[in-house]
Structure formats: structure tokens, C-alpha cells
């Protein structure tokens, strides 16, 4: 367990500071002060670390969305808040964008996302698509996850602003789940009224602290300062 803790601590630091693709296994082993065989026995590969971290991060996002939402908000609004948070987090730091995009690119983490999200989508949007089974929602999630990956991959600029990205994504994804146009408009207007960058910054720090608490490692100033570029 001590070796696993050191590896996770090293990966959180290196992934945040350098990105997933910018971090090598050799750098992780050196930072964690473990042998190559220990790393392979615990995680097998860098993808194994990503899977474990991603599972925790995605679960934490749903919890964070509930703290942002008002008590009377609909499940569809909660979905909009959670997905808007994820898109905004990837705009805070290109290395975080790299982590999230990779999570949507590797078979193991993609399948985790599909399966864990399907039940949530069925609960949220089942009333909009009453004839659909969980299997149907699994198939829809494959498509909506592809939309999410595409929008995360493309960074914002002076023309394609965060607000435009959120509006485009939410209109497309809510349409997939048969949310009526007037309700989509109300949800999108509400999201655009929120200071999503400030909310996402706060949520990001909470998520990383939750990671530290869950995997029992200490955060330091370097990790904290690297979160938001």
C-alpha cells in the first residue's frame, strides 16, 4: 500500500504539472521511488493509474454538481451543471484537458464512463424517453460521450468562447435525450448565468483534495498552484 500511495501521489503531481501524455512511466517510477516491477504489479501500465484516478474524479463531479444546484432543480439541470463543470475544468488547465481527453480515449476508462454514466442517464432522462431501456441509454451514452470528448479537445479562444461551447454542447446533448426545446433553453440560460470558471476552480480544488484524502497522500503548494494556469 505504501508503494501504491507513492505512485498515486507522483501521478497526481506529474499529470497536473505535465499532462498525461507528457508524463512517462520512468518519471513516475523515479518520482514515486518504486521499482519498475512494483509499478507493473500494482497498475500494470500508466493507463491503470488513469483508470483509478478517473473513476474517483467522475464520481466526485456528480457530488459537486449537487452542491451547486438549487434544491428544486430538475435532474436535467443537474446533468447540465455536471457536464458544464467538466467542460469548464478542462479550460482551466491544458494538462487537465489532456487527462480528461485521455480518459475518454482509452478502452478501459471509456467503458467505465459508459457503464457508470448509463444508470445516471436512465434515472435523469428516463421520463423523456419512456420506451427506452438502460441498454438504449448505454448506446446513447456512446454518442454523447463522443460529443463531450470533441468539445473537451477543442480549447476555447476569442471566437469560440466558453459560453458558446457550453451552449452548443448542452443544446446538442439535451436534444439527444429528448428534452423539449423550451426546457433546454431554460437550462442553458441558467448555466450561462453562473460564473462557471469560479465554480469549476473551486470544485477542482475540492476534487483534488478528495483524491488526496481518499488515497491518503498530502497536497503541497506545487500541486495546488499547478491546478489553474
Q: Where are the model-predicted features located?
A:
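The short coil/loop that forms the "turn" connecting the two helices of the helix-turn-helix
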Residues: 2-3, 34
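Helix-turn-helix
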Residues: 14-48, 52
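Short, hydrophobic secondary-structure boundary micro-motifs
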Residues: 97-102, 183-186
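Pre-recognition alpha-helix immediately N-terminal to the DNA-recognition helix
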Residues: 6-14, 85
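Amphipathic alpha-helical packing segments from all-alpha helical-bundle domains
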Residues: 104-156, 160-171
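An amphipathic alpha-helix adjacent to DNA-recognition modules
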Residues: 4-9, 21-22, 42-66
